Amino acid sequence: MTRPSGEIFATTRWTIVLAAGGRGTPQADVALEELCRTYWYPLYVYVRRHGHSREDAEDLTQAFFARLLEKNFLEGVSNDGGKFRAFLLVAVKRFLANEWDRANRQKRGGGVAPLSLDWQDADTRYQINPADNISPDKLYDRAWAMTVLERVITRLRDENSADGKVAVYAQCERFLMMGKDAISYGQAAAALQMSDGALRVAVHRLRRRYRELLREEISQTLSDPALADEEMQALFSALR
């Protein structure tokens, strides 16, 4: 069932983390780890674009998360911390500037790996990034935006699969994807043996649910869900 929009994101993962501050609570620890598991790839991309090898980027990313997940890391971070995306970027910049030597002195594989991450997939995805002069910051934002959209599409697929609407979703999804050559409504409706009008209604509902999930995903990374529209604009700009 679709939850109503409106007052549903007064509490987000990021507000839970910020409210705990440096004290750490089980709920905040879980919320922060979920955020890190979701958005680790943009950090890896940022470190790679800074010129680090795959192996060093893996080590640095894990070392950063080991530091981030320490109980006292968030001491002093105000409860109006804004956007997790911006916080994480500033934090990794400081980490690379101040702690690279210490991290580099650790024996490879000897440190703590706080998160189990798919490095092979990360490297494969990184290799398809354009080999241009795009800055690490811009590539980070682009990877973040793609991560958000991928999560939304995955959730849409899962919801429709659970509702037994796999075939309908497979056709409707074509009308969601940006830059993808979509078949006509008539062709898609014929493939599903439904009317053109019925398909248009299904696509309209899917787009509406897509927007709801997109806002929900974005809001989970904000201290104030009222920032969702601003963050949405920033992420779409990063994809241009």
Descriptions of predicted regions:
Residues 1-240:
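Intrinsic, short, N-terminal disordered tails of RNA polymerase sigma-factor systems
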